Amino acid sequence: GIYASMQTRIYSSKGLIRYYDRENLMPDILNLASGQYHVFVIAGDSVPAAFDTPYYTGSADFAVQSGETTSAEVKCTIANTLATVAFSPELANVVTDYKVKIFTTTGELSFTESTVDSVGYYMLNGKDRSLAWSFEGKKTDGKNYTQSGVVENVVKATKYAFTFSYNADNAATGGTFIDVKVNESTVDSTHNVVITQRPQIVGDKFDITQPLYYETNSGKEAAIWVNAATKLKNVKLSCE
């Protein structure tokens, strides 16, 4: 799943101090010195264009105070621009073997009837802000038919749903007989990553790092405080 590809980097003022991935799994609890930190998380595959391959990124700043428990949450949002293609049923009456290419300057995907349920994921570079498309097919008279266009100012975390349909009025006047509609919608897809500092365990009115001595049969109560950022499943105490 998406979590198997997750990479987490934690930075301090000195630079990168922790790195976790599928080979070096991040523990549930981290032991960090007091100070300011920045965490950056990525998940998925960052490729120019691919079907059903999301890519998530997220970052957050957090501070660790001495003697306190800290929990940092990173919200990872989708970094891709998405595209889907649908064909109206009447297209099959006027054109065959049709397909649509949707592409950027770095990646291209071909959509056919067999891929109408697939979602194309595109990574836009710094200057690329458009999705170009081309329709190719063969008319009933055997001649090839092509039509193309561009959707400008596309953004990430947004899906562009292309619908290709037959326009009989344009066909009758010799114009382009394919109508193209593009519906734009925001993609609200996130993954949360929680980074937790090790629980704080202290003695009540005594130093827990030092032994407690009692005479036989004359012990007294001793309280231990466990301060955790998240709910603990269990706490085990032992003595010798």
Where are each of the predicted segments found?
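Short hydrophobic alpha-helix segments
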Residues: 20-21
